Amino acid sequence: MPFGLKLRRTRRYNVLSKNCFVTRIRLLDSNVIECTLSVESTGQECLEAVAQRLELRETHYFGLWFLSKSQQARWVELEKPLKKHLDKFANEPLLFFGVMFYVPNVSWLQQEATRYQYYLQVKKDVLEGRLRCTLDQVIRLAGLAVQADFGDYNQFDSQDFLREYVLFPMDLALEEAVLEELTQKVAQEHKAHSGILPAEAELMYINEVERLDGFGQEIFPVKDNHGNCVHLGIFFMGIFVRNRIGRQAVIYRWNDMGNITHNKSTILVELINKEETALFHTDDIENAKYISRLFATRHKFYKQNKICTEQSNSPPPIRRQPTWSRSSLPRQQPYILPPVHVQCGEHYSETHTSQDSIFHGNEEALYCNSHNSLDLNYLNGTVTNGSVCSVHSVNSLNCSQSFIQASPVSSNLSIPGSDIMRADYIPSHRHSAIIVPSYRPTPDYETVMRQMKRGILHTDSQSQSLRNLNIINTHAYNQPEDLVYSQPEMRERHPYTVPYGPQGVYSNKLVSPSDQRNPKNNVVPSKPGASAISHTVSTPELANMQLQGSHNYSTAHMLKNYLFRPPPPYPRPRPATSTPDLASHRHKYVSGSSPDLVTRKVQLSVKTFQEDSSPVVHQSLQEVSEPLTATKHHGTVNKRHSLEVMNSMVRGMEAMTLKSLHLPMARRNTLREQGPPEEGSGSHEVPQLPQYHHKKTFSDATMLIHSSESEEEEEEAPESVPQIPMLREKMEYSAQLQAALARIPNKPPPEYPGPRKSVSNGALRQDQASLPPAMARARVLRHGPAKAISMSRTDPPAVNGASLGPSISEPDLTSVKERVKKEPVKERPVSEMFSLEDSIIEREMMIRNLEKQKMAGLEAQKRPLMLAALNGLSVARVSGREENRVDATRVPMDERFRTLKKKLEEGMVFTEYEQIPKKKANGIFSTAALPENAERSRIREVVPYEENRVELIPTKENNTGYINASHIKVVVGGAEWHYIATQGPLPHTCHDFWQMVWEQGVNVIAMVTAEEEGGRTKSHRYWPKLGSKHSSATYGKFKVTTKFRTDSVCYATTGLKVKHLLSGQERTVWHLQYTDWPDHGCPEDVQGFLSYLEEIQSVRRHTNSMLEGTKNRHPPIVVHCSAGVGRTGVLILSELMIYCLEHNEKVEVPMMLRLLREQRMFMIQTIAQYKFVYQVLIQFLQNSRLI
């Protein structure tokens, strides 16, 4: 080259490093933390990071400040980019966290965490010499500080540690002897405070400091309009002016001031009453700008919140007592300002208008309850004098209400304390337009029984529409009186944690920490009859199962720790085989404790989703085994089949099923490949099944089979062909359809190109374990009290699928057929048979569409068969009515079974339901009644009570932290159950929903509704569809990614990854959606709902096992439907009552519903839903007795 240039290619321009910077923040306890931010990050985001570390919610009292290049304290302008602000004004990128807005009394501070940080700030003010105090005051304050930081006097052998502890202000120059004498006096003061809780000592310390000269003041040197040098100060009552010798000249109250501005280097304070302007001059323009904006911010904050803005008659000062507790702390207390002695004690009323302060991202004074029981961070270490930073007398001045959410795993959840209920929250007018018509008067019991005997009252459908929301006093919270509550002890459980014990006594006693156990691990000894365990089809692998850890547990130990559900009943007569007779079982549903354990497998997507979650991610399908052929053959069974083959089979099966519905339930035949049904007895031999093993963590509803996916396994079919009993009537099918189905090839169809391990939800594939073709799952479809179909797989053909795999798209199961028909044939792989016989199948589908209009009365019977056919299963044999009928005389019904059934049959539940109050008599709805929160509720009459509502960390968009959700806590038999009952998210509240899930540490979401029902939106879809772009969506500060979805007959299980964008933390959330609830009424298939409850319990146990060793070991489960009261109440009440049945607790359904409604109004909206709970309990008892 002519130019001797050598270009270095080793250096890279790191864009990420150029866009980020690290800032240090010194906390009030002198610890320093680091925060990595982008160059565009504002001071607000940095403050949120600090709030996350401190688990702080009431950030509107706090702020960040720095030392300027002239060593003056300056507050950060939170709305501006932090890096640019620090580069321009700061001496170094070091921030200080502190209190910005002081209050006249500590009772303004609602949270314990807020009070602790406030205590650290005022103690720092004392030790740094900002407040003038006498030696007696110093000793008294030092004694309280030692009690607050170290505890009682008798915990230490000697008081020598006090010599290393900073006790006195830094500017107090003391000789060694005097210092020793004062230290001994502090030790005596410490001993006098023995027995006072640290939190109480902190409050007493703050109370003492409030009376010191200079408390909460910030002073700037200026010149008045006459050129005299004065001190211009600001505090929580207003602005004051002092001369250089400290004499008070004048004080301007907040109500006396209008605008506060600046003109060049002059500060202008407009006085309203005097119609004049006070002028103060500074050295430069920047200083005048800073002071004027600071004063304007303080003025706006205090005036909007009515803190010390009006004169009021305050009660006399409260005398300090040794047993003084925080709950007895007065809400109003005078503040004495030396030497003026101005009293200020009036409480504020909250306002909710936005503020455009340069210092605050959002500085509304909103006081919210804490959901975290925050332990105080005591100063147990050694602090030297040099560790306390000495700064200008600046007291923190920042207000923000959005936070980086703390990791729920590390948070200590508890019930929020009572808010101070203010009259300002009460709406001034009634919204008459939203009040529904009054509830229909309830007839007396005799009238009801008389109508029932006459056949007038239909127990299944009576008053379903009329028994909807009974909202006759929806505005009971519009009361004119002021409601003031004292702050409760935040370390204790709160009164609405309701115990539910066997004695039937329901009181609001507090729950001790020892009682706060996982309901699933809290085993209550039961009666001998209840503890007898029989190995049935639900336990085919227990002998070879290995639990968590390295222990080998016996079956009894395993059941003791995990509280297994009793499996569904054996059929009658009992099978003779020793292994589970899967081919002849007639379970109504195959759920987590049913014989489908040996056919479940671990999906590839589950492994990538979460290694520890594989025991729960499963193919929990309730399937019906319906083989179409029964000839002897030795064929290789391929695991994977094309979507076209299976969906074409579905279309043929629907046509066949449609015609079969014309016949009586027990008289349906199966379409055989050759000839009519053979005559013979109903008994047959079934080959035994091989054993399968796995060593992953298991639960009663989630057994999985680990098998290789690297090779196709072959197994010969058994030689024996079971005989099918002769039925009285034969079903006739189209000859063309029979011919088409008979020509189904035995060889597997061509596979899809590309990855072989991921198919859509509509595609089915064989299990990934080596299974004989005769192996299958069984179930019974319940269509009525005395009607049932027994279905089993006896000799499956080569095309019978087994289960659903993880999908790349998320179609509804009922729409697979329509989707396949709409897609062009050339775009889908098709098998040979169906490409030839497509016209025949389509002709049958046309016939089906014509006959569909005649089948409206049988819709409830047809739907389960259609879903079973869509799962790739077919009817193999149908036993007669004699076999299917459950002999009630053989069921060992106990007293509870008879009592529940009697109530249901005699209609006693109707009167029982009507006598339960719809909601709490004196419920408070302060936050929910605010105008800005009206649009956050789906139904404005259904809102949470104030004392147990879920409180979010306030943000700019939601400055009250409101969401229509309630904590539901009930203690049953010593075990605490914790739910969050909430409404289905609205389009504009999805980010609030995910914020709640994150902050409350939720790992399981139970959704008891579809997104749309009957053309109406029930719940906005708040999670991304599988197969959408990256399967991810962002909701506010959270990114949600769908990892997999598994559909069963009546519910769908979805695995989600939730990432907090600000902190980068991720968490797994399980989404369980019940999909079988009809548009009106309740599910007809009670056993299906029971299987859904078992699925929830299984996932709960798994997620809780992942939280061992953390503070939040038992997070709540979010349950929601549309309004969050009807179906949500059914699920919660059913699960609680089943737990009572399992542990021989007294079953009081109306009493439990009453307790639930005291925590969330209108739980269980209709009598039909209430009756359905009884049906669920009866079915559960029936299952448990048919072992």
Curated annotation (Swiss-Prot):
Q: What class of enzyme is it?
A: hydrolase
What does the tissue specificity note say? Ubiquitous.
UniProt GO cellular component terms? cytoplasm; cytoskeleton; nucleoplasm; nucleus
Q: What upregulates this protein?
A: Up-regulated at protein level by cell density. However, at the mRNA level remains the same regardless of the status of cell density.
Q: State the active site.
A: C1121 (phosphocysteine intermediate)
UniProt-listed CDD domains: FERM_B-lobe, FERM_C_PTPN14_PTPN21, FERM_F1_PTPN14, PTPc-N14
> Which stretches make up the Tyrosine-protein phosphatase domain?
909-1180
What superkingdom does the record give? Eukaryota
Summarize what the UniProt record says about post-translational modification: Ubiquitinated by the ECS (Elongin BC-CUL2/5-SOCS-box protein)/LRR1 E3 ligase complex and subsequently targeted to proteasomal degradation.
Q: Which UniProt keywords apply?
A: Cytoplasm, Cytoskeleton, Hydrolase, Nucleus, Phosphoprotein, Protein phosphatase, Transcription, Transcription regulation, Ubl conjugation
Question: Is Ubl conjugation given among the entry's keywords?
Answer: yes
Q: Name one GO biological process term.
A: negative regulation of cell population proliferation
In this chain, substrate is annotated as bound at: D1079, C1121, S1122, A1123, G1124, V1125, G1126, R1127, Q1165
Biased composition regions of type Basic and acidic residues, renumbered to the chain? 815-824
Its function, per the record, reads: Protein tyrosine phosphatase which may play a role in the regulation of lymphangiogenesis, cell-cell adhesion, cell-matrix adhesion, cell migration, cell growth and also regulates TGF-beta gene expression, thereby modulating epithelial-mesenchymal transition. Mediates beta-catenin dephosphorylation at adhesion junctions. Acts as a negative regulator of the oncogenic property of YAP, a downstream target of the hippo pathway, in a cell density-dependent manner. May function as a tumor suppressor.
Q: Which disease is it linked to?
A: Choanal atresia and lymphedema: A disease characterized by posterior choanal atresia and lymphedema. Additional features are a high-arched palate, hypoplastic nipples, and mild pectus excavatum. Influence clinical severity of hereditary haemorragic telagiectasia (HHT).
**Quaternary arrangement and interactors, per the entry?**
Interacts with FLT4; the interaction is enhanced by stimulation with VEGFC. Interacts (via PPxY motifs) with YAP1 (via WW domains); this interaction leads to the cytoplasmic sequestration of YAP1 and inhibits its transcriptional co-activator activity.
Name of the protein: Tyrosine-protein phosphatase non-receptor type 14
**What are the top taxonomic ranks of the organism?**
Eukaryota, Metazoa, Chordata, Craniata, Vertebrata
Gene symbol here is PTPN14
